[in-house]
């Protein structure tokens, strides 16, 4: 559904979770202007009709959640780079429904090459889980594991009870702990092939607007590993060039709201 520039400017300026944006934000015909920089607003139902080539756009971020297949009757993510749209590359901000290179920063970004037209950046939960699994596997070896993500509610749920194809997501998001499915654990095998088939997981949506957690339980190949050893390797990994800024480490007694605005 198309949203006008005035509404987009307002929602950027005033955010219920992160507060008021401290830069000047305004709207004009066909654009919003953020701190003096104009950002064009274009709305098309079919991605092949978007004028990326004319605008000189090299890389498109496909974050609608609608075009998760390369091609389909309603359009696909490759339409951004083929069929006339004219971009050179497309990055999905969600798992793809078909085979595509999946990249999690700090874990599999060495697999990116210039020949790829499209990559998936996986899900938020996979990006949380994969660096942790990578460090544990490289240090101690993972035989198998189970993950639970306790996740903030999202727009895929209902704010009040209302019909939804998933009867649990049909319930008011801010009033219940809502079990739901997740493919994040299995998707780790896409960015860490050596863990393919070794991890599984469940998800709980909880009544917070931001701040989620992954609880990972693993059976390690190395026996008698202590808590201190695990904490030590995670802390050291968080300070490496590979994972600095991606994996964080703290021993503070923090809660989910303390992660709000954290850039890792």
Swiss-Prot record:
> What does the entry list as the binding residues for D-glyceraldehyde 3-phosphate?
123-125, 154, 169, 182-183, 205
Per the UniProt entry, the Enzyme Commission number(s) are: 1.2.1.12
Residue ranges that the Swiss-Prot or TrEMBL entry lists as coiled coil: none
Q: What does this protein do?
A: Catalyzes the oxidative phosphorylation of glyceraldehyde 3-phosphate (G3P) to 1,3-bisphosphoglycerate (BPG) using the cofactor NAD. The first reaction step involves the formation of a hemiacetal intermediate between G3P and a cysteine residue, and this hemiacetal intermediate is then oxidized to a thioester, with concomitant reduction of NAD to NADH. The reduced NADH is then exchanged with the second NAD, and the thioester is attacked by a nucleophilic inorganic phosphate to produce BPG.
Answer whether the UniProt record assigns the keyword Kinase to this protein.
no
The species this protein was found in: Borrelia hermsii
Q: List, from the UniProt record, the residues annotated as the active site of this protein.
A: 124 (nucleophile)
Give the superkingdom in one word. Bacteria
* UniProt protein name: Glyceraldehyde-3-phosphate dehydrogenase
Catalytic activity annotation = D-glyceraldehyde 3-phosphate + phosphate + NAD(+) = (2R)-3-phospho-glyceroyl phosphate + NADH + H(+)
Q: What does the sequence similarity comment in the record state about its family?
A: Belongs to the glyceraldehyde-3-phosphate dehydrogenase family.
The record's note on quaternary structure and interaction partners says: Homotetramer.
Its GO biological process terms?
glycolytic process
Q: Where is this site: Activates thiol group during catalysis?
A: 151
- Name the enzyme's class: oxidoreductase
Q: Does the keyword Hydrolase apply?
A: no
């Amino acid at each position: 559904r198309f949203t006008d520039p005035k509404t987009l400017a307002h929602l950027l300026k005033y955010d219920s979770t992160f507060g008021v944006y401290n830069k000047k934000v305004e709207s004009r015909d066909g654009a919003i202007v953020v701190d003096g920089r104009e950002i064009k607003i274009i709305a098309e139902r079919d991605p092949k009709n978007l004028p990326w080539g004319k605008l000189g756009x090299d890389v498109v971020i496909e974050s609608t959640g609608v075009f998760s297949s390369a091609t389909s009757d309603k359009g696909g993510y490759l339409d951004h780079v083929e069929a006339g749209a004219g971009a050179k590359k497309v990055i999905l901000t969600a798992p793809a429904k078909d085979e595509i290179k999946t990249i999690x920063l700090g874990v599999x970004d060495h697999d990116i090459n210039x020949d790829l037209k499209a990559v998936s950046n996986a899900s938020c939960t996979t990006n949380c889980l994969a660096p942790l699994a990578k460090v544990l596997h490289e240090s101690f070896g993972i035989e198998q594991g189970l993950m639970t993500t306790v996740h903030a509610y999202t727009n895929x749920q209902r704010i009040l009870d209302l019909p939804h194809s998933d009867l649990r997501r049909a319930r008011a998001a801010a009033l219940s702990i809502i079990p739901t499915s997740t493919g994040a654990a299995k998707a780790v095998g896409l960015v860490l092939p050596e863990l393919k088939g070794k991890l599984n997981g469940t998800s709980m949506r909880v009544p917070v607007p931001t701040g989620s957690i992954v609880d990972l339980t693993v059976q390690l190949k190395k026996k008698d590993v202590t808590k201190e050893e695990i904490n030590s390797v995670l802390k050291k990994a968080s300070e490496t060039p590979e994972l600095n800024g991606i994996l964080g480490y703290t021993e503070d007694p923090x809660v989910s709201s303390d992660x709000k605005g954290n850039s890792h």
